[in-house]
Amino acid sequence: MKLAILSRQPDSYSTMRLHLAALDRGHEVDVLDTLRFAIDLAGDGPDMAHRSQPIEDYDAIIPRIGASITYFGTAVVRQFEQMDIYTPNTANGIANSRDKLRAIQIMSRHEIGIPATAFARNRDDVLPAIERVGGAPVVIKLLEGTQGIGVILAPDTRVASAIIETLQSAKQNVLIQAFVEESRGRDVRALVVGDRVVGAMRRTAAGDEFRSNVHRGGTVEAVDLDEEYEATAVRAAQIMGLRVAGVDMLEGTDGPLVMEVNSSPGLEGIEEATGLDIAGEVVDFVDNQVAFPELDVRQRLSVSTGYGVAEMLVREDGLWVGQTIGESGLLDRDISVLTLHRGAQVIPNPRGQRMLEANDRLLCFGRLEEMRDMIPDRRRRRSKVRPLPIDPESGRPVDDEIEV
């Protein structure tokens, strides 16, 4: 395999480990400065140059895109995708994970456990937002940031409001997130490669620091995750569009709460904690997947006029419950079932004899008119807002810690 590692720091631990792991396995590998690419676009196909020279014919890339170059870095990765060169982490996946709000929105939509989170811009909406996540103390986060930078613990509502107002006056967008007391100063990092967790560690903050990042002096220890934590980590990474990711989880009372999905996870801490060859796992996975570059399936399947992809629900009171896919009549209507989603389980390419259960969701390809009456109704919003009392004189929400 001819491999390119995209990195601005060729001497960093993670880049060097990936480089050596590839060489040890007999692969040809180059480390390329992400900012030295130039993207060429023309009607005869996409192309690129690196340091003003045409790039070589690579089989795969491993992107290590830093937060400061997200826009250009994802453009480079996207260009490799358009050239049918395999990448374990797509441009969309990197962009999804880098924006904390977008990542939380995606995970919330797919019902992955997350700390209660709010996003508000208007000053009048800040206090109600703090109340909706459970009240102070709260964690305030900038939308972009790594290694614990831009993460602040506000002990009470007054301080939280002042911090948010200051950051917003500096044109910063912030998230307001519930503080999970039972996981104070510690979290779990699971390193996901493909469809499994290849290593995990618990990070513990130093002293009174509530952020457990290794770069902030935290300590690490290897940890064996139970099935729930492993499944949550893998599902979070895959939903984000990442095949190599570091998934950070808080140990909540009711199970794992995903804080962040990192598209360029550092390898030093987890390799030292576990003694495992994580870099080798990444290279082996890429080698096994190199023949299957990422495809925009929905876009390609929708090219045929009148055909497309849709999700169908097996309703509890519907005729399909207890029937097989073959008995449902879908195949007779020229509708192909691509995947069957049952809770957190995904069954690819289910056969005709597969029995259907209530609340199964079928990802199907077929004629749109045939599928129209089978598409589930839009999910009703489940309001969880706990309104604050209203001051009769000002008409504004009242908080016990704020003078009105």
What does each model-identified segment do?
Residues M1, D224-R298, S302:
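ATP-dependent carboxylate activation and anion-phosphoryl transfer catalytic cores
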Residues R36-D57, A67-G73:
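Glycine-rich, highly charged phosphate/nucleotide-binding loops
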Residues A67-N89, D377-K384:
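A short, gly/pro- and small-residue-rich
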Residues Q82, G352-R354, M371-V398, V404:
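Short, compositionally biased
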Residues V151-A236, M240:
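Phosphate-binding site of ATP-dependent enzymes
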Residues P293-V314, K384-D399:
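Long, charged amphipathic helices and adjacent flexible linkers at domain junctions
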Residues E316-R378:
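Cytosolic Rossmann-like ligand/nucleotide-binding regulatory domains
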